[in-house]
Amino acid sequence: MTDKLTSLRQYTTVVADTGDIAAMKLYQPQDATTNPSLILNAAQIPEYRKLIDDAVAWAKQQSNDRAQQIVDATDKLAVNIGLEILKLVPGRISTEVDARLSYDTEASIAKAKRLIKLYNDAGISNDRILIKLASTWQGIRAAEQLEKEGINCNLTLLFSFAQARACAEAGVFLISPFVGRILDWYKANTDKKEYAPAEDPGVVSVSEIYQYYKEHGYETVVMGASFRNIGEILELAGCDRLTIAPTLLKELAESEGAIERKLSYTGEVKARPARITESEFLWQHNQDPMAVDKLAEGIRKFAIDQEKLEKMIGDLL
């Protein structure tokens, strides 16, 4: 009897949404994704202490300025954790640009290149790295430029169709539409508190994006993220990739039974619309109160965890 995780792998590339190396060894995902919150959590794991110490020692060699040392050590720690994960996954690691740069295209590009250089200096080629950027207009423009320079990007905190469309038109490598956080918003802001997986608003959003991309021939990878239960995951079987937290990977691995493919596209490829303009993007995104709330909240939360990480690093300098 097969388990649901093995069955899911027939249709979808499974990615681990964690910085926990023990979980990588256990579930053997193709790729892994990290973010400031996951890096902060990983930094509390005793086995990672040597990675922190290395980042701090390295930063001290780069500059005598304490503020710069904190920035350097934080970047180096994210890359050090990524390097450990890359020993265990055959595919790619996603490493996130500082969320406080989400509205600054040039600063985002500079930070992305900095992270890439740290990986390259450690012997990792660009084809094993994805740079994560928030799906703001500025983040999408940064990704468009980085893609032209051979740096593949993962556009995260994606909640609206306008964001998804702009990402595809920018030619970004991959998007991470957030399923569970969409569900959270609808539960908190509407009278409906329970949703069957097929009508879960996060599942519906990702399904619509997947269909739109396939029917217009966009090559941007759709990677569903931020799951609250395995029902959401099973409804998206067939999505290009799904990034899943270890607790849900465990639940899938311990659940018996084959699953059926839910997402696929076999129709003809249609003509693409004209590119969305900045004003159209901002207006359409603004028309979706869930997306407005969740994008802003996500950026704030990642920024808070980035600052906590920097404080932890600062205390060690």
Swiss-Prot record:
Q: Which domain of life is it from?
A: Bacteria
Q: Which CDD domains match?
A: Transaldolase_TalAB
- List, alphabetically, the InterPro entries matched: Aldolase_TIM, TAL/FSA, Transaldolase_1, Transaldolase_AS
UniProt key word Cytoplasm: yes
> What Gene3D superfamilies does this protein map onto?
Aldolase class I (3.20.20.70)
Q: Name one GO biological process term.
A: pentose-phosphate shunt
Give the multimer and partner information. Answer: Homodimer.
Q: What does this protein do?
A: Transaldolase is important for the balance of metabolites in the pentose-phosphate pathway.
- Give the family per the record: Belongs to the transaldolase family. Type 1 subfamily.
Q: What is this protein called?
A: Transaldolase
Query: Origin organism of this chain?
Result: Escherichia coli O104:H4 (strain 2009EL-2071)
